[in-house]
């Protein structure tokens, strides 16, 4: 028998309207799209846009935990367990893309890094990535210190950017 239903799939709902507003994100930066990010149709490729989300969350993590990507000194080891991207509009080169980043949720051993991409104030995509804190034997609880740092960049209502 062939399964025709969606019982075995996982999808993400459309993003909340507040996610489409740059002023909901506590961390904002600009990045230029590269010529090589274009596909054959002249659009910025979806993989290139995902790389911009990845860069925004990496920049946020590094600002919160400066040694996180230094394997010799890091005290935290994060791994991605889930990544949901919504591509909402086309983008073209050349473009300056404003990235927004923040924390969407804090769990026991993980948190959701939430990012948005904006061109001329219009949201072209959002991404939610579940990052899990790992120890030697698997996931470990987030410390109070880590939780406090993450709380400083929780997504929130308009910040007046």
Predicted regions and their residues:
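Catalytic strand-loop segment that frames the active site of acyl-thioester-processing enzymes
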Residues: 8-63
């Amino acid at each position: 028998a062939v399964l025709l239903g969606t019982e075995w799939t996982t999808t993400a709902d459309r993003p909340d309207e507040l996610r489409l507003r740059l002023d909901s994100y506590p961390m904002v930066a600009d990045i230029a799209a590269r010529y090589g990010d274009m596909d054959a149709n002249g659009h910025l490729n979806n993989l290139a846009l995902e790389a911009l989300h990845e860069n925004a969350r990496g920049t946020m993590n590094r600002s919160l935990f400066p040694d996180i990507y230094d394997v010799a000194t890091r005290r935290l080891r994060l791994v991605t367990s889930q990544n949901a991207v919504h591509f909402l509009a086309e983008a073209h080169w050349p473009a300056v893309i404003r990235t927004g980043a923040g924390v969407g949720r804090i769990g026991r051993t993980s948190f959701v890094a939430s990012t948005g991409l904006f061109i001329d104030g219009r949201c072209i995509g959002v991404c939610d990535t579940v990052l899990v804190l790992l120890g030697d034997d698997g996931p470990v609880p987030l410390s109070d210190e880590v939780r406090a740092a993450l709380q400083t960049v929780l997504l929130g209502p308009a910040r007046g950017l």
